[in-house]
Amino acid sequence: MEDAPAFYGFKNIFLTMFATFFFFKLLIKVFLALLTHFYIVKGNRKEAARIAEEIYGGLSDCWADRSPLHEAAAQGRLLALKTLIAQGINVNLVTINRVSSLHEACLGGHVACAKALLENGAHVNAQTVHGATPLFNACCSGSAACVNVLLEFGAKAQLEIYLASPIHEAVKRGHRECMEILLTKDVNIEQEVPQLGTPLYVACTYQRVDCVKKLLELGASVDHGQWLDTPLHAAVRQSSVEVINLLTVYGANLNLRNAQGKSALDLAVPKSSVRQALLLHEGPPALSQLCRLCVRKCLGRTCHHAIYALGLPESLEKFLLYQ
């Protein structure tokens, strides 16, 4: 029993040391976080990244380096954003992943914030470490207003083939209006991106019927997909009868084979509605259909405009335009 006081004394000393160590470690983390923020505000991104690496162990999406301007842009707080800009904060501050405040504003669809940033010198074509631009983010959110503002300030509508493609993102999300705006800026409707294919192929993969229809109307190649895989292959995999019917009406070739040597019909489940839809179009097309396809092919991508200049009867115009 005489050893009991000594035991409790050692226990209290141990607990005190443990609590002191824990508090000291917490204090260091708080200090480093404040130091990180200081370096971000001063614009020393390299040092901020090094400190964040020590604190967070190299997490790929660290939110600790988001400036107040990032927060204001992401939440659409225009007054706060303008106040920060007036105080002299750099509008082109980026996070460790190269995300700018303009990226945040466009991802949130906050067009007023995006415009304010652009008017104060924000880089319109800034890229994140993943190659995403503010225009890509605007297409992701489906903000046609942001897309228009970015294009007015010189945003590149079409980037290099290996960067994140705005039109593919718009189609993937089903944002037809954003897609149409980009196409008016001479974006290549046949642009094939590795792992994604053409915009039409993406639309078929994600069953974006409105986008499929509009792309076909605007002259997208009905058989150009992802390498040897056609849009029809993608539609069959998704069991989308509506998309299959659209593609076949626009002249999709049922006999084309992919890298595995399979046609769209080979991929269809036996006795399914998809297979029945394909079989309905397996025979030779009508002469009127062949003529329509031939005329549209000769006129090219601008056929939807050129047809009106031919001086044809209204009924024939509507037939050629699939109306």
From Swiss-Prot:
- Select a single GO molecular function from the record's annotations and give it: ubiquitin-like ligase-substrate adaptor activity
Superkingdom is Eukaryota
Residues making up the signal peptide according to the UniProt record:
none
Report the subcellular localization: Endoplasmic reticulum
What keywords would UniProt list here?
ANK repeat, Endoplasmic reticulum, Repeat, Ubl conjugation pathway
| A GO biological process held by the record | endoplasmic reticulum unfolded protein response
A Gene Ontology cellular-component term? Cul5-RING ubiquitin ligase complex
Q: What is its main location?
A: endoplasmic reticulum
Please name the InterPro entries in this protein's record: Ankyrin-SOCS_box_domain, Ankyrin_rpt, Ankyrin_rpt-contain_sf, SOCS_box, SOCS_box-like_dom_sf
All residue ranges annotated as the SOCS box domain in the record:
273-323
Q: Does the keyword Phosphoprotein apply?
A: no
Q: Could you tell me which pathway this protein works in?
A: Protein modification; protein ubiquitination
Looking up Pfam families in the UniProt record yields:
Ank, Ank_2, SOCS_box
Quaternary structure, per UniProt, is: Substrate-recognition component of the ECS(ASB11) complex, composed of ASB11, CUL5, ELOB, ELOC and RNF7/RBX2.
Family label: Belongs to the ankyrin SOCS box (ASB) family.
Q: What does this protein do?
A: Substrate-recognition component of a cullin-5-RING E3 ubiquitin-protein ligase complex (ECS complex, also named CRL5 complex), which mediates the ubiquitination and subsequent proteasomal degradation of target proteins, such as BIK, DIRAS2 and RPN1. The ECS(ASB11) complex acts as a regulator of the endoplasmic reticulum unfolded protein response by mediating ubiquitination and degradation of BIK.
- Protein's UniProt name: Ankyrin repeat and SOCS box protein 11
**Organism the protein comes from:** Mus musculus
Q: What is the lineage of its organism?
A: Eukaryota, Metazoa, Chordata, Craniata, Vertebrata
